[in-house]
Amino acid sequence: MLIFPLINDTSRKIIHIDMDAFFAAVEERDNPALKGKPVVIGKDPRETGGRGVVSTCNYEARKYGIHSAMSSKEAYERCPKAIFISGNYEKYRTVGDQIRRIFKRYTDLVEPMSIDEAYLDVTDNKLGIKSAVKIAKLIQHDIWKEVGLTCSAGVSYNKFLAKLASDFEKPHGLTLVLKEDALCFLAKLPIEKFHGVGKKSVEKLHDMGIYTGQDLLAVPEMTLIDHFGRFGFDLYRKARGISNSPVKSDRIRKSIGSERTYAKLLYQETDIKAEISKNAKRVAALLQDHKKLGKTIVLKVRYADFTTLTKRVTLPELTRNAAQIEQVAGDIFDSLSENPAGIRLLGVTMTNLEDKVADISLNL
């Protein structure tokens, strides 16, 4: 007996676009001498005493087992000839904006998931093109021609399958999953490839003898619910290719923030305040991009011993003014008890967000 009703809308046309090794690809585009060489976006451990982590890397570096969140030291040990680049996040954001403008030519139903990936609902698109595959190919062509980068695309009738499809053939691939092929497509996938199934859930599923989509499909609904609660029903639906989550062009954001981890610890107040200023300006720019205002400013400080402090101040009025955000974040820092340990991370976040209701100038 089904505990929750199964409703499977297969009429939609959803595309998931995922840029290929985005940060590294931008660096290769701007410096062709990097092509064919292992490129790592992160601090060079030879310059930082082994500190720092990998933000991302290109496909050449991935051949050595390098991946995001790996320590820069380990990345260097795996591939001493790797080229380390600190990264230019303002440049990446500008390129990301350029790519999103391309998406908007085809549909306004664009849901960015990060700077380098997005869902598009092209069921009713601006150009009246019936084939979602054709639109995906046009987008790939436009991005290559105008931005000089490649992307992978997944096409299906829901977001879950479209994302799995975009991961199936990288880089610069295009995979279509039709409703009649969905069960076969899912059956062959390792369960850890299922989007939304975290590491702990994977371990639990493995303990139950579930390793593939085919294994998951054979498990009764009540068994999954007994082991995972409501998430068990989600797993039951995923195994059957069912997901009716809409593409939300205006995703509700609860906060907008900017934080940075430092390979070299910060001790001097002038350096600390300068980094707070950079984060504040980044937050103000993001608020501008998303047409949001905020009331509560949060400062996050992590020290060398990994002690982490967060403190917030709620303003009387909404703002997205960079100077005001910087001032308040700086005042919050001044109010913290002195800690002789150096600072390894600083973050500034704005919460209590509302849509822009007035033309408030952005002072950078």
Curated annotation (Swiss-Prot):
GO terms for biological process: DNA-templated DNA replication; error-prone translesion synthesis; SOS response. Pfam families: IMS, IMS_C, IMS_HHH. Residues 14-198 form the UmuC domain. InterPro entries: DNA/RNA_pol_sf, DNA_pol_Y-fam_lit_finger_sf, DNA_pol_Y-fam_little_finger, DNA_polymerase-Y, DNApol_IV, PolY_HhH_motif, Rev_trsase/Diguanyl_cyclase, UmuC. Mg(2+) binds at residues 18, 116. Keywords: Cytoplasm, DNA damage, DNA repair, DNA replication, DNA-binding, DNA-directed DNA polymerase, Magnesium, Metal-binding, Mutator protein, Nucleotidyltransferase, Transferase. PROSITE patterns: UMUC. Coiled coil: none annotated. The record marks 23 as: Substrate discrimination. Its main location: cytoplasm. GO terms for molecular function: damaged DNA binding; DNA-directed DNA polymerase activity; magnesium ion binding. It is found in: Cytoplasm. One of its GO terms (cellular component) is cytosol. Disulfide bonds: none annotated. The active site is at 117. It catalyses: DNA(n) + a 2'-deoxyribonucleoside 5'-triphosphate = DNA(n+1) + diphosphate. Its EC number is 2.7.7.7. Its cofactor is Mg(2+). It comes from the Bacteria. Binds 2 magnesium ions per subunit. Monomer. Belongs to the DNA polymerase type-Y family. Poorly processive, error-prone DNA polymerase involved in untargeted mutagenesis. Copies undamaged DNA at stalled replication forks, which arise in vivo from mismatched or misaligned primer ends. These misaligned primers can be extended by PolIV. Exhibits no 3'-5' exonuclease (proofreading) activity. May be involved in translesional synthesis, in conjunction with the beta clamp from PolIII. This is DNA polymerase IV. It comes from Streptococcus pyogenes serotype M5 (strain Manfredo).
